[in-house]
Amino acid sequence: MEIEVVLGIGEDAGPKPCSAEIESAEKTLKDDGVVQENGVRVSDNGEKKSDVVVDVDEKNEKNLNESGVIEDCVMNGVSSLLKLKEDVEEEEEEEEEEEEEEEDGEDEEEEEEEEEEEEEEEHGYCVGDFVWGKIKNHPWWPGQIYDPSDASDLALKIKQKGKLLVACFGDGTFAWCGASQLKPFAESFKECSKVSNSRSFLGAVEEAVEEIGRHIERVLVCDCAEEKKHEFDSPLVNNAGIKEGVLVRDVRREMISSLLIGKHGEILKDVKSFAETVSFSGLLELEILKRKVSAFYRSNRGYGLTEYHEPQSVPGLEDKNNDDDDDDEEKNVNDGLQWRAKRSRVEEVAALDHEESSSLQRSLEKCSGFPDHRLPHRRKEKSITEIIEKESAAKVRFETEPADGDVKSNVKSGRKKTKRHDEVNGDLENVTTTALWRRRKSEVATIEDGGNKQVVESSKGKTSRKKKKMDVDDGDDDGSGDKEESEEKEISDLEINIDSTSLASLRKKVRFDDSVVERSTENGETATQTSKRERKKSKYLSPDFLSDFSRKGRKKSTIESESSKVSSQSQVDERVTDASDSLMEVEEDTLDKPCEPSSDNGLGQEELSRELSNAVDFLRLGATPKEMQDLIRVAALGTQYPKDSSSRDMVREFMTIYRSFTYHDGANHKFLGSYDSSDKEKEELSEMGKPVTKGKEKKDKKGKAKQKAEEIEVTGKEENETDKHGKMKKERKRKKSESKKEGGEGEETQKEANESTKKERKRKKSESKKQSDGEEETQKEPSESTKKERKRKNPESKKKAEAVEEEETRKESVESTKKERKRKKPKHDEEEVPNETEKPEKKKKKKREGKSKKKETETEFSGAELYVTFGPGSSLPKKEDLIEIYEKFGALDKERTDTVDNNFSAHVAFLDVADGEKAFESSLEKCPFTSNSTVKFRLKYPNERTEEKKTEAEVAETTMEVEYLKKKLDEMKLLLDGCEGGMTEEVKVKLEGEMVNLLEKVIEMRSS
């Protein structure tokens, strides 16, 4: 307990303390002091003190000794001194602790630096190295190592101890990677550069390769010329993991020198090989070579290689439809960068939802500081080249002027795609109208008729409401004027680029629309009106895709049209007397009019000429003949055809039309008659276009049974006829090709021959089965009277009927031959036609006979053959060497003389047997070949050749069978060895089965 007393200035005495106060003072000084006579003593505590304190203590002791009473002021001074002492001690202790902490921190930093250096020595990666980094759920990505001191605030937040800061190329992201997640860039380039084909990955690889090339060229140039160092100053880093203002780290010189290993002469050699082959093994190899050449140019002439810069977009021409998408992307860029920066942390990526992660990944594709043309989601901008192309294409336009001045032609650009929701009959229909659909519906076709042009206007694509209104007002005369006004407003001209569309599409756009109908009003005016919209059909069913300008397509169209005519005529039983009425006659004087195409192919030819006229009309309107000539010349002279596929298609179609009309039906048709169509095609055309004749009608009146029986007998006898009859039949078939010029002559014989050939082709069974089937059918069809009569007949009556029918057929054939002799055809025509109209069975027989004759001629060889067999591993002589060695013995068959690499053998064919024997004897005496292994000689005679072939085949069969038996015995032996004394039931059953099979095989061999 302390008592404070305030003394006034100049007071000599104060209140004297009581005994209690003296006792308290003695207690405070008990620990350090010594009690004297008066009871109070203060001593030093052993620490260094000041002189003031000592003097005060001495004075206090003196006062105490003198007076023996301690005053309050003295007590206060003692207490303050004690407190001051304690404060000084505490400050000294704190300073000592701070010094110790600083020393510990310095030691820790030194330890960390030492650890980092040890880690770098362990994994071998340094700051500035190019590496491939692998993060989970991402491919190997190119990047560069940076110092942790260069890390941004975002990177420091997710810093991980013992990992390296890697700044990724391309997308501007970063990652903290361990040594196990990294690979050297150059050593692993071939492996890691092919892990993905995405656009972002390829862009990152290209950027990394360019950066390495910059460092390589910098090292090469700076070594040669120090004054050019400023040209290769390091740029600023633009990455989310690196703070602003940091320059790109320099690469170690050891790494660059490892890429530049090689002799000086190899650079020139590599440049020559690249120039000749235009191929390189990798992108890095090409970049290194390019930088070497660029450094060489900089050292000699002061500047490097010419650089190619990709075309930049014109600002202000963005696609406005994608503005909203771009705004959303800009909002999510910051969040996306953070997410991509934290992609090394698997836990945070897994915590994100699927929708959030997908949206972030989509927004991350755009990073600041990188060109927009490398981003997958960028604004659609028009380049300067596209604008120039459109301006040049806009010069060629398809414009139509109004005939009476009523319709105004206005050139309009393609409008945007719009969606309208219209209500028709209470139902909502979503109609999506595009610019292409509007063009098709707003076609304006010009039709030339006698030199006067009539403009037929088709209304533009209307909505369903307008169509409904027009349908309702069809019967009203008052509404016609309103419709005309609305139609005049909606009609617009077409703007067509000739060079960007093919000939088929251009012809389709000019074609007259069948849905347009002209309607006349009371005032005499005409109004165009479109019919109701039909269901949309596939474009591949349109005549543009179905029409074929080739010879085969025209033949099919004519056959189809004529076959439909014949079928309709046969159903209605119309009587057509002349064949010239169904088919157009071919004019004989085609040379007098070479420009007019002949129309011998009927309606198909008319359609083709209409198609050609449309195409030529359009070419006259759009592409000039000069332009077409230039395109054809470029296609003929150019080593590589231009990449414009539209002009290529147009040239191809024009040339097909031109060639078909020149060589098929044009001026050269008379000279190239054989190229036009073969005789077989003419026969098919004549068969399809042949009308029904009177003779056929007479036969139809007879009974069906008799007709079928005659057909069967005729077909059966035609096969067994002599050569004379075969010639007659051939002459009958030749007559069919001339049916166009001679109307009704010999039609009955031709029809019978056609029917017989058809029956023979369809007939797959034998003649006996067909005759039995025909007899059964004939027994069912005739009436009861005919059945009774046939039962009465005996076999002799059947023979008589057959003889009568044979006489009739012979008479018909004789008449046909007489008529054909009058015509007097050239001999070569007579020979060609029968060969084409022969029966397929006879053709097959002739082919087989020809093949057998060829084989006989090939195998026929009267000389001897010397076979030389070499040991395995020896080199075989060439054919020329064999001929030189054995030609001195006699004449050789050089075609048969050859070496066989598979068998290590060679055979020499001598035309004379005696020469072969001489060569064989001399070869046995002295071998003409120099080889390490043994050489065997064998002579074959002509009569032994077939016998030896048979024996060789038999020997091969026997060896195969013996090998099979040996194999089976080995399998059985293995089964027994595997049993080891104890045989299971399964093994026993299997062994019995093998033995049974083996015995059966032995029995078969013995019997054979």
From Swiss-Prot:
Residues 399-409, 511-522, 677-687, 707-725, 739-758, 768-787, 794-818 have a biased composition (Basic and acidic residues). Disruption phenotype: Delayed flowering associated with reduced H3K27me3 level on FLC. The triple mutant pdp1 pdp2 pdp3 has increased levels of FLC, MAF4 and MAF5 expression, but decreased expression of FT. Its main location: nucleus. A motif (Nuclear localization signal 1) lies at residues 786-793. GO terms for cellular component: ESC/E(Z) complex; nucleolus; plasmodesma. Keywords: Coiled coil, Flowering, Nucleus, Transcription, Transcription regulation. Pfam families: PWWP. Residues 84-124, 307-339, 399-606, 668-874 are annotated as: Disordered. The keyword Transcription regulation applies. InterPro entries: PDP_family_Arabidopsis, PWWP_dom. Residues 78-122, 804-824 form a coiled coil. A motif (Nuclear localization signal 3) lies at residues 841-848. GO terms for biological process: epigenetic regulation of gene expression; flower development; regulation of DNA-templated transcription; regulation of photoperiodism, flowering. Residues 127-188 form the PWWP domain. A motif (Nuclear localization signal 2) lies at residues 809-816. It is found in: Nucleus. Residues 87-122, 321-330, 473-490 have a biased composition (Acidic residues). Residues 726-738, 842-854 have a biased composition (Basic residues). Together with PDP1, PDP2 and PDP6, interacts with MSI4/FVE and MSI5 to suppress FLC, MAF4 and MAF5 expression by regulating the function of the PRC2 complex and modulating H3K27me3 level, thereby promoting flowering. Belongs to the PDP family. PANTHER family: PWWP DOMAIN-CONTAINING PROTEIN, PWWP DOMAIN-CONTAINING PROTEIN 3. Interacts with DEK3. Binds to LHP1, MSI4/FVE and MSI5. Component of the PRC2 (polycomb repressive complex 2) complex which regulates histone methylation on histone H3K27. This is PWWP domain-containing protein 3. It comes from Arabidopsis thaliana.
